[in-house]
From Swiss-Prot:
Residues 135-158, 633-646, 843-856 have a biased composition (Low complexity). It comes from Homo sapiens. There is a cross-link at K439, K673, K690, K701, K947, K982, K1086, K1219, K1299, K1319 (Glycyl lysine isopeptide (Lys-Gly) (interchain with G-Cter in SUMO2)). GO terms for cellular component: chromocenter; cytoplasm; heterochromatin; nucleoplasm; nucleus. SMART domains: ZnF_C2H2 (SM00355). The modification Phosphoserine is found at S590, S593, S595, S941, S943. Transcriptional repressor involved in organogenesis. Plays an essential role in ureteric bud invasion during kidney development. The gene is SALL1. It is linked to Townes-Brocks syndrome 1: A form of Townes-Brocks syndrome, a rare autosomal dominant disease characterized by the triad of imperforate anus, dysplastic ears, and thumb malformations. Minor features of the condition include hearing loss, foot malformations, renal impairment with or without renal malformations, genitourinary malformations, and congenital heart disease. A zinc finger (C2H2-type) spans 43-65, 449-471, 477-499, 706-728, 734-756, 766-788, 1001-1023, 1029-1051, 1134-1156, 1162-1184. It is found in: Nucleus. Its main location: nucleus. This is Sal-like protein 1. Highest levels in kidney. Lower levels in adult brain (enriched in corpus callosum, lower expression in substantia nigra) and liver.
Amino acid sequence: MSRRKQAKPQHFQSDPEVASLPRRDGDTEKGQPSRPTKSKDAHVCGRCCAEFFELSDLLLHKKNCTKNQLVLIVNENPASPPETFSPSPPPDNPDEQMNDTVNKTDQVDCSDLSEHNGLDREESMEVEAPVANKSGSGTSSGSHSSTAPSSSSSSSSSSGGGGSSSTGTSAITTSLPQLGDLTTLGNFSVINSNVIIENLQSTKVAVAQFSQEARCGGASGGKLAVPALMEQLLALQQQQIHQLQLIEQIRHQILLLASQNADLPTSSSPSQGTLRTSANPLSTLSSHLSQQLAAAAGLAQSLASQSASISGVKQLPPIQLPQSSSGNTIIPSNSGSSPNMNILAAAVTTPSSEKVASSAGASHVSNPAVSSSSSPAFAISSLLSPASNPLLPQQASANSVFPSPLPNIGTTAEDLNSLSALAQQRKSKPPNVTAFEAKSTSDEAFFKHKCRFCAKVFGSDSALQIHLRSHTGERPFKCNICGNRFSTKGNLKVHFQRHKEKYPHIQMNPYPVPEHLDNIPTSTGIPYGMSIPPEKPVTSWLDTKPVLPTLTTSVGLPLPPTLPSLIPFIKTEEPAPIPISHSATSPPGSVKSDSGGPESATRNLGGLPEEAEGSTLPPSGGKSEESGMVTNSVPTASSSVLSSPAADCGPAGSATTFTNPLLPLMSEQFKAKFPFGGLLDSAQASETSKLQQLVENIDKKATDPNECIICHRVLSCQSALKMHYRTHTGERPFKCKICGRAFTTKGNLKTHYSVHRAMPPLRVQHSCPICQKKFTNAVVLQQHIRMHMGGQIPNTPVPDSYSESMESDTGSFDEKNFDDLDNFSDENMEDCPEGSIPDTPKSADASQDSLSSSPLPLEMSSIAALENQMKMINAGLAEQLQASLKSVENGSIEGDVLTNDSSSVGGDMESQSAGSPAISESTSSMQALSPSNSTQEFHKSPSIEEKPQRAVPSEFANGLSPTPVNGGALDLTSSHAEKIIKEDSLGILFPFRDRGKFKNTACDICGKTFACQSALDIHYRSHTKERPFICTVCNRGFSTKGNLKQHMLTHQMRDLPSQLFEPSSNLGPNQNSAVIPANSLSSLIKTEVNGFVHVSPQDSKDTPTSHVPSGPLSSSATSPVLLPALPRRTPKQHYCNTCGKTFSSSSALQIHERTHTGEKPFACTICGRAFTTKGNLKVHMGTHMWNSTPARRGRRLSVDGPMTFLGGNPVKFPEMFQKDLAARSGSGDPSSFWNQYAAALSNGLAMKANEISVIQNGGIPPIPGSLGSGNSSPVSGLTGNLERLQNSEPNAPLAGLEKMASSENGTNFRFTRFVEDSKEIVTS
């Protein structure tokens, strides 16, 4: 046993300046062995044993050194050779004897720190307890010190030795003095040192700390009060007990690890090699802890020895803590009772402790000097019954600091002991600087709560302890439901709220659960610290017991049929394939089925929360996962259905619920293990109580059928709910057939298809080289020429009244196909190949066509590229076509452009009524009739089998076959064809086409379908770029009246003309004025919509009247259009007075000026936020649209402030949302920007806060109320059936458009509102 000896100085009560050095020299002359290193140069202080290599440093130190300092000598050289230790003669007086005892005790205690052997590596700790009694003289004290290394010494026996320990330990017990026996401590000076063992608040261990209070108190030289000394002694004993408990837990962990690594059953006597190989880092740390704890215990026993030498030999009863009840209890517990030291020493000989002690020291029997000095930590293991039994919950007094012993070893060694820091200090300092220099006050504050790893400083020890877990990886708090671990209790509280819905009867475990208990199997199969069986077994268990073998793998999640898309997502995380039953759920690729999917989804969603609340599903233990980590497959807010281990549950195909009768029993078992009922009241008042109440309220209230069961978000409808589920699953069912990209919604797919679509240039009219028919879409023209070449269309010029239904058909086919995706199952779209459409039987009457899906040529974006493609036609047709296209490029539009286009509506109507009388009104022109329908050959009934030939969509007909199957037209698009698709398969894909689902509200150019004709009319202006509504202030044009009205609000009142607020009845309809009457304005709208009137500034002078349709239109439709030559954009003539920027309009300048003034006139009527522009407000309003109707989603939102109409007439505006009608009718915000128009807006109704200017969905309920005249003449678009529209209902599309032309009293306004759907403005 290597010991590092230091020359022992003798203390004199005389003047320290005179007596200390001679005494030290005298000791050296008496023949005491000196230290092995630098014995001649070292100068040792006679009071504190501090050594100095310079005499001047020693003299300087003695000025500040006080008597009776306790010195902790840190082991710096564990490999030093052992030396003999000769005792010095006893001192002459009793005071010297007392001081001599203290010094000897310190020397023995410090020498114990230098022991590095196998016993230390096995977490053993030597606590030498030298005792001085009254009858023992100085000789007995000296002999005790001299025989300390021997195996038969009394100190070795008292420290819990092995088999060679002597049994007579009761004679050498350490007793604590009573209060009355400390009166003789008058000469005992206060301990004044940098290092002191003090009782720290909120800690459970003895910590060597720099204490400013102790140093300041010691500087005054005052005497230590007896109560304070007793308090320190009692606190020291209590802390020592907690340290021994810590070592017991460390020993248990090492034995467990050793048994696991060696694949041997856990034995009580593991070999030294096994411990070295399995727990090498733990052995090093435990050795370090053993030294430090031995020093702490040695100090405690040295204090007790001093008290015992003064008070006498009489046996003292055990001293209890002041707050604890008095008694003669022996077994220490976590409650804090301080046992007597002699009981701890005598407990070594008990049979229960001898077994553990002998097992710990079995590998050291060969060393006679060590065999009898086993660790007292093992000796006290029998006394620490609560800590040694891992089945019992650890009380908060012990486990709040050491909740999990394995990661906390480094924390304790690095943070809670200053001895290692002192050792590092001494090693880093120069030899002439003492290691015990006092630090400054600021340094002490930093040193007290400073992280040893990253040097971060914290304000409290608890914050430091939590921070240290980030270094050690300790997660002491365990969720008793899913088994996840957390570093703090607050994180566990937040996490546990996610389980409240599924497990409302299970309470959270607020106590730390040691991590090593996770690997210990139990008889019930439920791991320690958990209330229910884990949903997947832990792979690191010693014996893999099945978890609840009564539960089979047939138990699964209660997934409703609305969540079939979650099944493949869950399957991807399963290690083994699991057969999924499709009896209760839809196919994995299908989200919506044709047979009442939403209804069944509603029922399942409605019934799910009650099932989830009443009967919670236990997990199946039939399979295991490779990793032991608990992973979240979906957001954990959905713990009611998809909690974190949901990826490993049973087959998701079984939609049955299972009531687990064991859950109440498991909850009671958990309560028995963790008696924390009193803590739940405080948890209710925590920061998570509001969240918990919110979750409970959600459980209690009636669930919305459109509520997401994962995040509890309420959607507007079932389709929106299904699209929302894709955000959780990551599913993208809608794939582009051209490029393969997938999208979550069909709207995104349709938006994406615009990338592939070849849009014609602005105002380009393509003329057929055969019949001179005009088309605005090049793809439509190609199909038209194909029909010419196939003989389906006569190669003679058609009259003006010829049907233009082909253009309607082919143009609307572009994107009607994707609008129809709502009406067929997504399974069909998923299962079919990406580059094709499933083949279906073809009609015998319909002409065959070849469709293939290939990438669309980029050359289709220009007319020049179209010319190159059309060179494949024969020479004669190619010359005519090229000449026509070149003329179009040069801008020389032929004279019959307007006539041909404007006659399209009438001709369309005549052709359909004459050629297909069997066609119902509901199918009209949306049936994509070919020009050959006048022969009545194909149209017997609107059945799918007898569908006429359809046009080629630009998405699918990217490569038309150059050799059609049945004599079709030439290939005008691509020279390569891929997969041949039969044309009538589209009839199967779009089954609602012949059922009147789509009326004549499809755009002939881009194929979009709208809910009403007025929306289609407004949409056509996006293609023609017509802006018929002109602002009289800045001459800007707008496509809709609503946009013009919104724009007018940007002008100040002084800018508005005075005639704006007066009736304009004095203006004649034929007057060529800048003021356009309402009747001529409506005529302009109709003729533009029906005939694509393109009035350019240069043509408006030569063309005072436009060509009107030849069909039976109303008289107002033939009224002249008097539109002056107004420029589209004026030069920049508006200047900002602040920064000098120029703008082309006053509205742009006004918006710009708001950046200088900070004005935000556009306020949100929902949340009150204000914005500088209406566009920003529109974007913001999208954040409030999550619970709106489907028509509101993804559409253009027109946000108007609560302004009233400019005039005194009652106004009825369109309202898209029925649920907002009652709340928003008549509402006005007086604090908004519109107050400046109070004079003009005093009379009339308030405008609604939200309106859709472009309606793209059907199913809009009509607003109740008077619609005015019920027999007004509507106007149809290009595809309109005029006869049907004339006999339509008053609430039919565009039913009130004529009200603007002929109002009841003949009073017209320039700001007459454009009518949308069945809502109108009644002007009087």
